[in-house]
C-alpha cells in the first residue's frame, strides 16, 4: 500500500541548524531558514529582486517579467472571514492574476505541515465576498522545507488535486515543495547545481559562496 508523503517519517539529516540569538557572533551569517532573515530577504519590498528571482526560478518564468508584475500583499489572513485567530503566512504576492504564498518550514511536525495546506486553502477562498458571485483565484503555495521525508531524494516536487488515473481536478490549487537538505547533499557530493539550487544555497551557506554565486549578477 502506498504511504502518502505527509505520513512518512521526517528526515532532518543535512538540515540547517539555527543558532540562538544569544550565541551569534559578529560577522555570523543568519541563514534564510531563520524567520528573521526570511522576512529581511524575501518578504521585503525593498529587496524585491530576491523574491522575484526565487519565484521566477521555481516557476520557470523570465525574471524581468516576474519583477515587473509582482505585487506584495498583506500576509495576514483575516480572522473575521475564517472564524479563527489571525494567521500570518510568511510571504504572499500577486503575479499575473495568481496568488503565490511562500512558507519557510523549520517546524517538521505533521500539524505544521497540515497548517501549510490550510494556508493555501485560505488564500484560495480569500476573495470570496458574502452576497456576491464567488471568485476563486489560482493559488500556488511554495513550501521551502528545512527537512525532507524518509526515502525522498527529490529537490522539488509539485502536488495538485488528481484522481487515481492522474487526471487533474483543477489547476487553481497547487503545492510546490522544495527540500533544502537534498540540495545541500547534492552540493556536498560535488554534483552540478542548477540556478535555483545555487540561489537557495547562497541564502543559507556560510562558506564557498564565491564559487556558488560566480557569474550570477543577482546573487553576486
PLM regions and their residue ranges:
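Elongated, amphipathic alpha-helical interaction scaffolds
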Residues: 1-220
